[in-house]
Swiss-Prot record:
GO MF term list: nucleotide binding
GO biological process: DNA replication; double-strand break repair via homologous recombination; resolution of meiotic recombination intermediates
Function: Essential component of the RMI complex, a complex that plays an important role in the processing of homologous recombination intermediates to limit DNA crossover formation in cells. Promotes TOP3A binding to double Holliday junctions (DHJ) and hence stimulates TOP3A-mediated dissolution. Required for BLM phosphorylation during mitosis. Within the BLM complex, required for BLM and TOP3A stability.
Source taxonomy: Eukaryota, Metazoa, Chordata, Craniata, Vertebrata
Family the UniProt entry places it in: Belongs to the RMI1 family.
Keywords tagged on the record: DNA replication, Nucleus
Gene3D superfamilies in the cross-refs: 2.40.50.510, RecQ-mediated genome instability protein 1, N-terminal domain, RecQ-mediated genome instability protein Rmi1, C-terminal domain
Name this polypeptide is given: RecQ-mediated genome instability protein 1
Region described as Disordered: spans on this chain: 238-263, 314-353
Pfam families: RMI1_C, RMI1_N_C, RMI1_N_N
GO cellular component, one term: RecQ family helicase-topoisomerase III complex
Amino acid sequence: MSVGEVQVIQAWLRSEWHIQVPPAWLDACVNWIKEEADRASIPQSQLNQRVLEQWLLTDLRDLAHPVLPERISEAQKTVLSNRCCVQMDSLLDVSQPAYNQLQRIRGTDCSNDQVSAVTQETQRPWEAKPTRMLMLQLTDGVQNLEGMEYRPIPALNANLPPGTKLQLVGPIAVRLGVLLLKAENIKVLGGEVEQLLEIHSQSRVLCGTLGLPEETHPQQEPDGLVASVADSGYSSLASEASLRHPQSQPLPQISRQDDWDMDEIPDDDFRSIPDHFDDLPQNNNPLEDVPEDFDDIPLDELDNVMCPIDVEVSAGTLEDPERNKHDSSLLNGSKPEEVSFPSRSRLGNTYQSRTLNKVPNTSLASCSTSTLDSSACKETPMYLCSLQAGCWPPKSPQVFRLQAFIVTLVGNLRISGGVWKLGATISDGSGYLDVDLSDNMLSELIGFSAAETRVLRKDLARRGEVDSGIQHCQRELVDMCCMMSVQVDLTGRGVVLSASPISDRECSEMQKRVKEARR
């Protein structure tokens, strides 16, 4: 084999497919192809195609040839402007309930589960219609990062096998190490990696999301996948280098509605609530889950939630898919008063689907049985991954100080038992926690207490003040990324007692902790 022949193939891969490979692998691959052909003469075009086929079936970790910009997975805000090819290890549809997806794969789903004796509430015209969202775990063989289906991408589907090769076409916006992908940003080249078919099968990924035991038998793969081929001869060469093997990590679960479509409603339409809102029929059954709205949030708004601390953390904790949220109004027999405040979902639950890598070494050594003093907790900001890696849930109510943002608002803002009620999921980038926003916090954001609101809403002259306060509260919650004092009860659910800007001292403490963990 001549050196010129290898250079021709390398130039063809770069010019036609934007594929970059190490010369050692290319040399070994060409030698193996010629040995399989008994050293017979192979036309250059056919040789090019066979090398491409071998690359499509190769785990890029074996090549260890970086093509992505350095430390792009840690970038808070940047743009990937060039073209490059990466490998998709796994993908997950985070717009669908993980449990329902697992049932469909196992063939245990039942259509009767969707039948209810209670009349379902009709979606209102101004409510945003949710869309599909796929989260992709990507690698160039050296760096791991995620891709989010920011706009519908017809070329992608949940049946793509692990190891599929993708061509990324810039410019692509990158936020917090996540590629925000549109249809024009991605081309599916095909391929698969045999070793990853079982490790990252859909059933295993979903089991990890739900916190269920992983299935021991391999998932039955759909028809039409690329057939496995013999070893290209590069394995012996790659075995001499230190390789990083993929690790299957659990993904936090996201509970969503099943009937998603591809329509999108801009934020302006979503926020325009009609004047006769209160005249519309309301769903007064407090046991029913309120569907979350899936907004199309512009990139400028995403920039407002950038975390000022550069922290690499582990996968978050999981939500319980079977948990029922009983309102306190059930105890006293009163029905909650729903206020016209649509629930929002930041980034389409992007952060809830993230698989992160490194954990700051701040795990709790023990779990105290005594209640922590809130002032003492405020002195030391904590990470959710560290708290949840210790004794969790705590054996007694405890107050923690977290730098966090609101990932999802659960349900509608309402008045129940004379106080404001609103559920949410918060994240500090290392984990996720279901919380209730305290009445004091909501009253400060709205500008009126629940009792004052009841009175003012009956006064037509001042009703607009309440509506303005609620809209202000919504905007503040959407952009909120600050220090939160959170009280966690024995069930692991929290209450956000207060929120305040991060101080210089707290910022320095967290930066110091991250640097110590990296050393």
